[in-house]
């Protein structure tokens, strides 16, 4: 009986989040920012910071997105279901973009604020998700074309 092999080690969501947070290949800096953000969340009165992070990512992750499909001369905005890996990617991207857009604070504080806000279903990352869902709802008439979109 042979062992199943894999080319890459599976990563936890925490490691993926740190990789998305990383800039200029400085993973140690990203880990420190993430750890400081968890401490800030703990200071804010939340018992388990990792639960807050998971719930914030879940609240900010989209279920449906819009993809463009050209048929003839017309371009249709087709709503398609988002795969779990892409959901995580978009949620972390939107949370980090919202945190980076803020100014005059250390990144760990900005990240902690954004995670707490996404945990409570408010602020920028959740608004991006709601906007994506609104666009999908508006273009629901073209949902039958989803099987033609890659």
Where are these regions (language model features)?
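Strongly charged
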Residues: 1-24, 28, 35-150
